[in-house]
Amino acid sequence: MTLSADGPEQNRVPNPQLAAAYKTCTQIARRQAKNFYYAFLALPKPKRDAICAVYAFMRHADDISDDESRTRAQRRADLDAWVDAWHRAAAGARTPDPVFIALADARQRFAIPMDLLDQLVHGTAMDLDVTLDEKAAYGEAQEARPWDTYATFEDLRRYCYYVASVVGLVCIRIFGYSDPRAEKLAEDTGVAFQLTNILRDVREDAERGRIYLPLEDLDRHNVHIQELATLHDGSHLTLNQRELLEGLAKRAEDYYASGRQLLPLISPDARPALWVLVTIYHRLLRRIERRGFDVFSERVSVPLTTRLSILLRGLIRILFNRLTGAAGQHA
């Protein structure tokens, strides 16, 4: 069975409120999605609209959990109230929220399980848990503070599952697939993306009290949390610091290798978009590697010209697929 519930666009009854809701989600994605949005452009419009609705939903959940003007307890309460409102909207209650309106429609059209969307929110809530008291772990230290950390890579991989692999599982339902192997490969692709994000954001996350690099890796390389929290010039990383970051990059490369096998398993009209997304994210990882893992001096990103070039290549793939498909029909 191919998992894609989208019917012909021309058979859908026009709904101005729904169209406006999708437009709002698209604007959110265009403004904030950066790498993701360029891949979205390579999708057919119905699938692009649905992906933008999912992104806008994720973005709002992240914004609630990241609102540092609120205490952690307040943010958790805010998130719970927001999820309750979403559940009511998904069950058919009237709502003024354009994200809920669009996502409720996308969920029905593409048979997205509610459980997966709940898991997305659970992933954002994981950032509200304090997992390490520095004094308890390392003894008295100047400016000791609580940290969000993960003891082992397996713990980190579990976090990556909720914040990224679940996104992949939602996306392939929108893309369309029939081979059950696609699910594990989508999970791996999500982990690859999240590990890349973690590498890129080491300094930014540390400033917010979050260290996603596994504590077992820090111990193995004799790197202290405070080193990462106070490092602002990555041009003089110690060997231990560089090897710590390189180890996570190697793990990401392994997940990219696994994730590439996903491409031929999804519907042909979604393959160019996935190719664009994987290519942009892998290019980001390579840029981090080429900079000697200096993610402290400035935020590493893929230049706009490079992203546009990758998108153009993705659009050419779409044109090629259409031409070869038309040729096959007339053969």
Feature locations, PLM:
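Catalytic cores of Mg2+-dependent Asp-rich isoprenoid enzymes
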Residues: 1-194, 199, 203-331
